[in-house]
């Protein structure tokens, strides 16, 4: 059984680092378009698990967590999405289905967890996570700050 794993992908070999930087640029463009402000990745890593390994509810550091679902052959019936919970951790507020090329963004202090995959799933549930803070040097920050 494979347990949760985390890999700091910004410290990976050059080719991987180049691809991750391209992915980050695309992720940040979506963040700018949807939230009106640029972010900086504080941490980035790949996370993966298989059937029988469940994520625990937790909160993240930083301002925003962005989770990218990279598996093109993922079947949504295998589940394995991400759930967000109320502040007391009792009720599920939102469930994001695992879907290829989806980006799920939410405030980092929100209680969340990776959901289990079904027994018939023989694939590795893999996500790429960016933990982000506001980019106070980016031109979008001043307008964002003044609008708050």
Positions of PLM-derived features:
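Catalytic core of non-heme Fe(II) oxygenases with the double-stranded beta-helix
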Residues: 25-147
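Non-heme Fe(II)/2-oxoglutarate
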Residues: 1-37, 147-148
């Amino acid at each position: 059984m494979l347990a949760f794993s985390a890999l700091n992908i910004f410290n990976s070999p050059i080719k991987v680092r180049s691809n991750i930087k391209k992915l980050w640029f695309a992720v940040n463009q979506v963040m700018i378009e949807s939230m009106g402000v640029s972010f900086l990745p504080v941490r980035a890593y790949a996370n993966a698990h298989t059937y029988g390994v469940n994520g625990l509810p937790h909160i993240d550091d930083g301002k925003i967590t962005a989770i990218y679902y990279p598996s093109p052959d993922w079947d949504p019936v295998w589940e394995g999405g991400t759930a967000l919970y109320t502040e007391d951790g009792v009720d599920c507020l939102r469930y994001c289905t695992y879907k290829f090329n989806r980006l799920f963004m939410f405030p980092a202090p929100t209680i969340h967890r990776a959901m289990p995959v079904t027994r018939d799933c023989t694939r590795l549930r893999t996500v790429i996570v960016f933990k982000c803070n506001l980019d106070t040097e980016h031109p979008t920050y001043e307008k964002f700050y003044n609008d708050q």
